[in-house]
Amino acid sequence: MAKTLTIIDFMQKFSSEESCKTYLADQKWGDGFVCRRCGCDHAVKGRTRHHRRCGSCRFDESATANTLFHKIKFPLPSAFAMVHLLTTTKKGMSSCELARQFGVHQETAWFFKRKVQLAMKACEEGQQLVENVEVDETFLGGREEGKRGRSKGSKSLVLVSVEVDYSDMTRRKAKLKRCRASVIENASGESLKQVLEASVEASAVVTTDGWKGYLSALTGKWHNVENSAQGANFEALHWHIFNLKNWVRGIHHHVSRDHLQSYLHEFNFRFNNRLKMGQQAIQVLATMAISPKSSYLQLMAA
């Protein structure tokens, strides 16, 4: 079992620019050096101990260059601390609060947080929900008078799937293991199928309400249909949806439709890695160290 990494341990480990750059260099070039200009795999000592110089074209590259830490506008220890807070605290932190705590502009904090969300997404990719899965849709966004049911109006429609454990428990108190939340255009069978095929293992037993879209989306799958009974038959799932909505309202107050999926990636990652005792921060840092840099426009489109 991995040792618990407390905030004190983390800050001592990454207390200086030197320690942060050493970690990033180890992650970035741990499997070998490849020059991103000419493709040569031979490196010599660079300008500093955290640089590598191509043995062929002599291009000098730093530990942060072409990573998600590329040209950040504040000290690396602060950036590492932000990653720890965003990954390990129960509800994360808004960009406004990050800006206040670390003394940076809100736009700077928001831009860096989007990079962290991108790494969180990468950490979760390819990890499908297995065994018993419950699925339902919900809306995230403002109210709109007269809109009911699956007519979303100006709201964003989100498909929420949870992997549940029924062992030694009544169905009402099923234990939630992992989750996925994805923005969908509508509740048609085609939209549902696209998301469910990507997020749920083909052999899983999927339980939904009687919405017709699920019937076509899950054709050929092990599919249970249950009446929602105003939430009584999906109590654990609906508590999870309730917590998701409270997180958006309470921490961020409002998330635009354009950026909602990135915040759902953050929510998914933090929930799915909640038992890693601080090690999830290291996982995200390692991913950021090997991920290519992203411009503002690229992050806006991600």
Give the residues covered by each predicted segment.
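Residue-level recognition of single "structural anchor" positions
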Residues: M1-A302
